[in-house]
């Protein structure tokens, strides 16, 4: 097993040395010194030992550095170097207005354009189908930035570099057709299409939750039970609201509007009238209820 690993590493080193013989790769990408011995697995470029020490300080998530002679390489790392190279990455930076000299290293390699280059390079290594108009800095990016001055471009580059962490996984798609009246018409139609699609989705959800069958329960018992519980909860809540609106609130309002002292007086008057209609009851009964103030004349 060890022999197989050594042979694989030797084969990878041979491939890297062959890629190093290509035009532009025999010089350090940063300082242009001859015979670089390190490569960047992130961008697929060759760099010298001094520049490797500087770039390694930015972190492996931004700039991964490996030695050709001392480190082991995976297949994807070697393919990145073979597909990229110094000239291709340098032309990419020039096309996007990023100067190769005179700017800080972090601003050069940790920005939106560099991340776009790394994503496209990784997709090419995975042999995915790539739309060449999909990523910033390739082919038709120049028509997208016509009329922009270099000063505005540099300021924008610094701003998006500072905010790049918030949009780490975002993909940037360029328009496939020239901006014009057709695109503005598409923008006007977009809200209506979005609204119709949203209404269609809501109708589908409502119809799906309102019909519960045995087949659905067998296919998805947990989902069916959860939807049933949701329907039951909605029905109970609606019944509670109806009961509260038709019984509880009118009763409370009726109690608040009634004049209790007058009701008590009317009750005592009615009770007194009943006492006068029954004169044969003994005196303690009346004194118990009335205190002796409203006894009929027969008991005085």
Curated annotation (Swiss-Prot):
Ranges for domain Arf-GAP: 11-130
Alphabetical list of InterPro entries matching this protein: ARFGAP/RecO (IPR037278), ArfGAP_dom (IPR001164), ArfGAP_dom_sf (IPR038508)
Alphabetical keyword list: GTPase activation, Metal-binding, Sporulation, Zinc, Zinc-finger
Coiled coil feature spans: none
An individual GO BP term: regulation of ARF protein signal transduction
Cellular component terms per the entry's GO annotation: Golgi membrane
Tagged with keyword Mitochondrion: no
Classification via Pfam families: ArfGap
ZnF (C4-type) ranges: 28-51
GO molecular function, one term: zinc ion binding
Claim: Zinc is one of the keywords in the record: yes
Domain of life: Eukaryota
Xref: SUPFAM superfamilies: ArfGap/RecO-like zinc finger (SSF57863)
Name the record gives this protein: Sporulation protein SPS18
């Amino acid at each position: 097993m060890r022999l197989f690993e050594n042979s694989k590493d030797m084969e990878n080193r041979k491939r890297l040395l062959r890629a190093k013989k290509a035009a532009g790769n025999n010089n350090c990408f940063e300082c242009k010194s001859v015979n670089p011995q390190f490569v960047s697995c992130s961008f697929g470029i060759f760099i010298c030992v001094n520049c490797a020490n500087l770039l390694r300080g930015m972190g492996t998530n931004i700039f991964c550095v490996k030695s050709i002679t001392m480190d082991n390489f995976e297949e994807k790392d070697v393919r990145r170097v073979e597909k990229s190279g110094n000239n291709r990455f340098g032309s990419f930076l020039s096309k996007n207005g990023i100067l190769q000299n005179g700017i800080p290293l972090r601003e050069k390699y940790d920005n939106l354009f560099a991340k776009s280059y790394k994503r496209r390079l990784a997709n090419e290594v995975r042999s995915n189908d790539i739309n060449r108009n999909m990523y910033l800095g390739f082919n038709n990016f120049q028509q997208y930035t016509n009329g922009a001055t270099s000063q505005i471009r540099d300021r924008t580059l610094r701003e998006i570099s500072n905010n790049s962490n918030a949009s780490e996984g975002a993909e940037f798609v360029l328009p496939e057709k020239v901006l014009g009246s057709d695109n503005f018409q598409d923008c006007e139609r977009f809200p209506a299409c979005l609204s119709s699609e949203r209404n269609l989705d809501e109708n589908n959800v409502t119809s799906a939750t309102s019909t519960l069958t045995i087949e659905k329960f067998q296919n998805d018992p947990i989902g069916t039970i959860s939807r049933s519980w949701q329907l039951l909860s909605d029905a109970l809540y609606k019944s509670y609201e109806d009961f509260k609106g038709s019984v509880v609130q009118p009763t409370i309002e009726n109690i608040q509007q009634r004049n209790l002292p007058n009701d008590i007086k009317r009750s005592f008057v009615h009770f007194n009238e009943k006492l006068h209609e029954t004169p044969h009851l003994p005196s303690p009964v009346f004194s118990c209820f009335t205190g002796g103030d409203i006894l009929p004349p027969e008991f005085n």
